Amino acid sequence: MALFLHKEQTIKIYLYDQKKIMKLFASTILISLMAFSTHAQVTIIGVTLPATIKAGDSNLSLNGGGIRKKVFFKLYVGGLYLSEKSSDAAAIVNADKPMAVKLQITSGMISSENMSEAILEGFEASTGGKTEPLKAKIAAFVNTFKKDEIVEGNVFDIVYVPGKGVESYKNGKLQGTIEGMDFKKALFGIWLGSKPADDDLKTAMLGK
């Protein structure tokens, strides 16, 4: 039909089509960038949390990360990894799905002894003081932090694999495995429960 249009009309139609193409192209690029940023690594006070990690055969993506602080000290950087994004803390804690928490020590104030004490306090808060049914499992988990001294730069991966349990890694080396959903819920509740170790870290882990 362009044969029957004036030259100016043909040019206007051409320019209109070009604008539509450019808008479509720009939208595609924006969507791609948003998808990339959702699964991008994050650097916090010099610590880089990778975009993805493995939990058994599952690939997990970084849901959010932040800093565990106490008074003026930045104790560690923590990241939460899930199979799909979520900001629902209770749903995450109760889910029988692959997930993980990565911790990198950023302070010389952390030692094996006070890390173990902090974990015990975390379980007390997470369970509302009802730790007796999990006593043996908690003790076994805490012992994995006592095998060697903890120093700044150490990395801990706490990985839940359904049907297998919670695997605890220090600097990539498996320290132990604790079975049971009851234990998994109490453990992840340390960071995501109603009385978390750090409110700001919880919010950051949830990607808020």
Model-based region annotation:
Residues 3-21:
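Short, Lys/Arg-enriched N-terminal segments with co-localized hydrophobic residues
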Residues 22-26:
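Gram-positive Sec-dependent secretion signals
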Residues 27-35:
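Bacterial N-terminal signal peptides
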